[in-house]
């Protein structure tokens, strides 16, 4: 399938050599983002979003802690594990900025949802704390893409959508 051919976004790339640190790097960074998002959503003007965020924050904090502990273990382990987690973080890092881009939708939802850009400082503090403890440097890389929320995607999005639509197209009307 597509995962085998390599035609998919790097952010969703399965571990290139079986190294679980690729998954840990993605989980750590995305959980750091989600932790800020759900913390801020608890201040939402929408009571349903507040309730969901309250429950979700506890879960994502668990995932953040789990991934952070693995970052520390890998960075403090062998030379090979340290080198590989550095590569994993560097490979995922270009996709981080897109999480914090404000757009027209978030502007219209002011009060109900936080501005993505307002989440960046907390994210940076969380990530910097773990990276410092692990004696790792923040990767200095160019952002990969920053318009996905506004509907502008690379051609790789088509490959991802094709992969996601394979089952429903193969088995129309299928249900669990």
Predicted regions span which residues?
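Internal, conserved structured core segments that host functional sites
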Residues: 12-66
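Acidic/His metal-coordination segments adjacent to aromatic residues that form catalytic metal sites
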Residues: 1-27, 77-78, 92-111
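Extended, helix-rich structural scaffolds rather than catalytic motifs
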Residues: 83-176
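A contiguous pocket-lining binding segment that forms or flanks enzyme active sites
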Residues: 48-111
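Histidine (H) residue identity feature
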Residues: 1, 8, 63-66, 153, ...
């Amino acid at each position: 399938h597509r995962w085998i051919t390599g035609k998919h976004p790097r952010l969703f790339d399965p571990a290139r050599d079986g190294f679980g640190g690729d998954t840990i790097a993605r989980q750590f960074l995305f959980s750091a983002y989600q932790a800020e998002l759900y913390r801020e959503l608890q201040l939402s003007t929408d009571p349903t979003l507040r309730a969901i965020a309250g429950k979700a924050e506890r879960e994502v904090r668990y995932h953040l802690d789990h991934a952070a502990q693995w970052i520390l273990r890998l960075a403090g382990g062998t030379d090979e594990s340290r080198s590989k987690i550095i590569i994993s973080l560097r490979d995922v890092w270009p996709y981080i900025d897109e999480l914090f881009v404000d757009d027209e939708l978030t502007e219209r939802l002011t009060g109900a949802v936080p501005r993505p850009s307002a989440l960046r400082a907390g994210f940076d503090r969380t990530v910097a704390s773990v990276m410092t403890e692990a004696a790792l440097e923040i990767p200095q890389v160019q952002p990969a893409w920053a318009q996905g929320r506004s509907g502008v995607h690379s051609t790789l999005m088509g490959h991802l959508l094709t992969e996601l639509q394979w089952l429903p197209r193969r088995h129309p009307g299928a249900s669990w």
